[in-house]
């Protein structure tokens, strides 16, 4: 916030990226949302019942992954820890498209084999900043965007061919 106050996070779960709702928790969440909407809109308009998803997993079609190189040289992919530049490794998030997760894992391995320098937010040194993947459920198309700190991407054709060999879709 501009006035110096910290913004409180609504999500109090210990690891919001990896947390998955049980069916019962999901139903309670829908009831809570219904109650909140009825409170907010009572007197203005009738509130139709909130319709939940039949399968509330693997629906997110946009996946973004950050990378970090550990001291032992291993490259991990994941999300930034809240309020830091520290990357927390995540695999198999229950709301993100499974194809995108597999591509991120393979890209992480390709970065290691191509000896790519992972960008360090604190030092400002490195090449690979993050990867964004969009999937289209209707067409099956997948778009991979590699965000770099420089317009020069060494061995970009070889890297793209290696990725296409692993994921021709």
Predicted segments with their positions:
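Accessory RNA-recognition modules of RNA-modification enzymes
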Residues: 1-169
């Amino acid at each position: 916030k501009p006035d110096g106050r910290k913004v409180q996070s609504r999500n109090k779960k210990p690891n919001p990226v990896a947390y998955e709702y049980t069916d019962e928790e999901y139903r309670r969440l829908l009831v809570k949302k219904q109650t909140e909407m009825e409170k907010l809109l009572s007197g203005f308009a009738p509130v139709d019942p909130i319709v939940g998803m039949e399968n509330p997993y693997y629906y997110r079609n946009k996946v973004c992954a950050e990378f970090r190189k550990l001291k032992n040289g291993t490259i991990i992919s994941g999300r930034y820890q809240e309020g830091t530049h520290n990357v927390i490794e995540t695999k198999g998030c229950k709301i993100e498209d499974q194809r995108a997760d597999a591509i991120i894992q393979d890209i992480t391995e390709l970065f290691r084999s191509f000896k790519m320098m992972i960008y360090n937010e604190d030092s400002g040194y490195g090449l690979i900043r993050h990867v964004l993947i969009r999937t289209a459920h209707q067409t099956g198309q997948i778009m991979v965007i590699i965000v770099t700190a420089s317009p020069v991407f060494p061995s970009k054709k070889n890297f793209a061919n290696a990725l296409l060999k692993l994921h021709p879709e």
